[in-house]
Structure formats: structure tokens, C-alpha cells
């Protein structure tokens, strides 16, 4: 069985590599036509999509999937609407492919600059949410990449139905079906094959739980764009507007508990902790948030004692750790030690503090007087995102269309020869 899965994935990889050469040179109009046609196909296939999703939901219930997983799995009419809107939005985004910048003349007379080009073949591994199939396919297509999509086994019927719509859209734009391929097998060996085919796959983007991302990072022979955790902090400094800080901290935690940009630890300067924490804690309790705190926090409000593990934990739930710190130095030290380099915020009106925080906090996004919940490609003006990277090579932060491309140097001459004036 493993051999047949390997052969199957090799066929997908070979087809994707060939298709990448076609989509890489496709015009913006042709790519946009495929996106718009896919949106129309989804709209026409609502009944088929709902029926396929109902089968996945029934199987999920029978297999004991947790309610939260079932909720992410559901393709509601509103989510189908959102997929359609998303495709049309991506069609409206500027095409990064072929953009040329930094052209300059060198003393030799040649011109040197950079051109933005697709990465090639992008492998995407994700869990549960079938709408990711459309998000990923649309961004890869618009950025001129072929893609191989390996969704979770629990969404296999939904993903197949969505793939049929994508295939119709590609056909209408006269693009190869292999530009977007959805892995049909639920065998987990497919993941192992996908992440070890550097001859066919240029980059892997895993989207899912920590176990999946750790496995991909450990075993891949292909570059990986990923983040492991979203352990995000908000630091309320001694120079903060406390009313503003309370609103920011509340939004950072409660906007959505399950997003990777949700605040997991609140750091409060000792100078203002007694004035700030009682009202802040009352607001969180009213919302049903469980509070855990350090010893200095517990001297001020009644909370569960925080352990060392709490500072390392991405809760993705209505739980918040609170730590009172001596000042900016301790706040930065805590964030850089315990954080996941995702998104961290300071609330302060002191400009030198703000500049230090922005420069010294080692995270892919640093917020000033704004909640970490803003860590999102759409909010950043990228239109959409394939994921958020906490790595430092190639892409960092929300990865949109430009993050799915790279640059090559272009050199233009008129017969100049090296070594000759």
C-alpha cells in the first residue's frame, strides 16, 4: 500500500512540476478568469457541496470528532458565500508576478534589477476546514504556482467536491487541471511522500495542530513556511492610557480565542498594576475567561496560581495568564524567552519605550497601541494569506501573494564585456 501511495504522489508531483511551467507564464487575465470561473462553479454546485459536506459531518460524528472540529468542518451557506467572495477578491488583487524593481546602471554600463517570479510548486497540508482548499488554491494560482493540497481525511468528500469546481474553473481558462491537485487518498503516507519530494515540490506550508507542524518540520526535505505556536503577549506599560489598554487587552484575548493571534499572556507594569488589574479582571470574568497569575498578580486579584508551563502555553481557549513585571526590560525579556515570535503588543504613550519594544521584541509582528488580534493578512492589506510564518528566511508574518513568490536578478546590457571599459 505504501508503494502505491508513493507512486501516486510521485505522479502528482510530476504533473504539478509540468503544470507550474504553464501557470508560471500565464497572463494575469487568464489567472483571473480561472478564479472567477471557479467562483461561478462553486455558486452553481451549492447542492453538491452541501451533500458532500453532510457526508463528512456524519462520518465525523460517527467517529467521535469534537464539536469544535465539527464546527470547523461544516460548509455552511455563509462559508460557501465567503469562499466565492474570497475568490473574487483574490482576482482583484495586484499580480506580483513579473514586477521589476530597483533597476540601476552599473559603472560597466549594464543595468541590474530584480524581477518577481513564482516559487514553482507549493505543497499545502491542512486539517479540518475545507474552505482552506479554496483559500490556498486561489493564492497559489494568482501567484503563478502549481499546488498540491492534502486536506484532512475528515474533509475528504468536501475537498473532492471543491476540487471539481476548481477543475472546471481551470478548464474554462484553458489551464491544466494539474495546476491545482487535491490528494485523493486519506493514507497518512501521502504526507510523508509530499514533504520528501524536492525534485517536484519547492515549498511546504503546513496549517494545523502543533503535532502536524512539528512532524513536517522534522521530516521535510523541502523548505517549510510555518509557525508552531501563537503565544502572544500584550504589555501594558507604566505610560499607558489605562482605559485604552483595557479595551486593547480585552479585544486581544476575546475577539476569537482560537486564532493564532489571540493574547495568551498579559504583562502589566508594577507601577500601574494595582490601578489596572481589578477592573481588567472583572471584565474578563464577566466574559467567562479563566485567569491565572503570578505571585504579584495574586496579591492584587483573586486568580489561579500560574505555573511555569502556563507561560509556555498557547491555550486557544478562554484562559489567560497574567504577570506583573518590573518594567520594559522584564517585559521584553519575558516575551523573547517564552513567546513564539508570532505577534506581541505594547500599550504605551512613551515614544522611546515604543521604539525599544519595536526594535528588541523578536516577533514577526509587533503592535503598538493595537491588539494582537490584528495579526492577519486581510487586516494588513494583503487581501488574503496562506498562513503566518514565524521563521526569518524567505517570508515572515502573514504570507500573501508576494510571499508565494521570490525574486531573481535581471541584467540588461548592450554588448558590454566584463573587464573592458
Curated annotation (Swiss-Prot):
Pathways involved: Amino-acid biosynthesis; L-proline biosynthesis; L-glutamate 5-semialdehyde from L-glutamate: step 2/2
Disulfide linkage: none
UniProt-recorded Gene Ontology molecular function terms: glutamate-5-semialdehyde dehydrogenase activity; NADP binding
Catalytically driven reaction(s): L-glutamate 5-semialdehyde + phosphate + NADP(+) = L-glutamyl 5-phosphate + NADPH + H(+)
Keywords: Amino-acid biosynthesis, Cytoplasm, NADP, Oxidoreductase, Proline biosynthesis
Broad enzyme group: oxidoreductase
One matching Pfam family: Aldedh
GO CC, one annotated term: cytoplasm
Example GO BP: L-proline biosynthetic process
Protein name as catalogued: Gamma-glutamyl phosphate reductase
Gene that encodes the chain: proA
